[in-house]
């Protein structure tokens, strides 16, 4: 039996509730979700579903089937993208010469190879979110939230992390919306100050894609086109969704042990695992 992570509503760096996921038989060209010891997260990058595990970065290539991306089996914890570049944090693979933790590493070939960017041997981000040249990372060792305005080259601490998710504006540097105690907080200066966005909904996950916001509340997916002031329900699930991840081509939502994707901005979803 395999474990799939789900975000908890508790405040902290990043807290996972564990859900059982059934495995299937191995194929000749891929492993299964059941073959890895621990899954940290699931994200979409372009039209691919990537699985972050203790044994490396994998692509979901079939129903419960995964294929290792590249050869380096990093223990991938935090993970995000800025344009075509992938950014990750976590721990080196067994036998690697990389320091532990690996700090922030970057890939410009889709995860086939990685190069150090910053904080090598110092920081283990269990949470990474970014857009444009802005990156936010929550360090599991100190519990602090860090911010970079130059794609992770330099960082400043914002103090103890109190957010469960952050959606970073792709259009304005320093602008982001965070979830704290299920409420939305807007910043235009990288959390030097925040303004609460008044809303009756209680949110668990939020993503910013182009000029639209997408968020999970209860068992439904919502969309906002006015920076979170008003929301329109676009999909409802049988169960409480856990993970929300969005690219220009694909949207992903997990419900319990199931993974769903949408190719029409969340209007309809297909179960893929």
Tell where the protein language model's regions lie, with residue ranges.
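Beta-strand-rich domains and repeat architectures in extracellular enzymes and scaffolds
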Residues: 31-58, 77-78
